[in-house]
Swiss-Prot record:
Residue stretch(es) of the prosequence: 227-253
GO terms of biological process kind: binding of sperm to zona pellucida; fertilization; flagellated sperm motility; regulation of flagellated sperm motility
Purpose of the protein: Plays a role in fertilization by controlling binding of sperm to zona pellucida and migration of spermatozoa into the oviduct. May play a role in signal transduction and promote protein tyrosine phosphorylation.
Domain UPAR/Ly6: 53-117, 143-218
Keyword match Repeat: yes
Record's keyword terms, sorted: Cell membrane, Cytoplasmic vesicle, Glycoprotein, GPI-anchor, Lipoprotein, Membrane, Repeat, Secreted, Signal
Post-translational modification summary for this protein: N-glycosylated; by high mannose and/or biantennary complex and/or certain types of hybrid oligosaccharides; possesses different oligosaccharides chains according to its subcellular localization in the testis.
Transmembrane segments: none
Subcellular location: Cell membrane; Membrane raft; Cytoplasmic vesicle, Secretory vesicle, Acrosome; Secreted
Assembly behavior: Interacts with VAMP3. Interacts with LY6K. Interacts with DPEP3; co-localized on the cell surface of spermatocytes, spermatids, and testicular spermatozoa, co-localized only in cytoplasmic droplets of caput and corpus epididymal sperm. Interacts with ADAM5.
Name the UniProt record assigns to this protein: Testis-expressed protein 101
Major localization listed first in the record, in broad terms: membrane
Amino acid sequence: MAACWVHYLLLLLLGVSHQTLAQSLQCAVSKVLRLEDDPSRTFNWTSKPDKVETCNPGELCQETVLLIKAEGTKTAVVASKGCASREIEAVTFIQYTPPPGVIAISYSNYCNSSLCNNSKNVSLFWKPPDTTATSKILGALSCPTCVALGSCSSAPSMPCANSTTQCYQGKIELSGGGMDSVLHIKGCTTAIGCRLMAAITSVGPMTVKETCSYHSLLQPRKAEESRASGRSTSLWVLELLLPAVLVALTHFP
């Protein structure tokens, strides 16, 4: 009987110890919503040392950033760090809409060691788009252009690169991951219809809702041009488990 009691006590202590360890994961915490001239040089993603939270069981550390830019505008930066529900560690990079015109990309990292969500900048995956080549090949299309944290009803009209297909005018609503924000975007785009975010409805822990006005469908190019440019539109997603990502990053140019 005594041996059974000792065995039960050991199992109980091990269970408490395991639960304590599971709850001891600490993550950096921050949320950022701003416009940057060149995020690869000016955006500091470092969290304050005292901004730390302890995760619940079943949560990992996460860091997520969404970047949206139109030609001639500043770049909208929406960034979140903290604990989030996730089963496995993973790094994901998505280019929703390629240049020329409005560009949208995101990066998210889920990791399972304390304060592992410690990226300091976005220079590894964000490079300022080179507009020198496309600016010399302008088509007949011009679009109101802006990226704003609020309304941009008086956006200036900008000429579009020849490979763009329409004027985009929409808003991106973001919630979760400490965010509750709306981005207003206008500009030339290679996307077809209301698909700046390629119909993807989440970015890391953030839920995404994209809505467009009627003006997004104005001034489409000829069907032949639309089909030709559509072939060059790309959406690519890279999702790797953490060990593979660490190997890849050590060889990053």
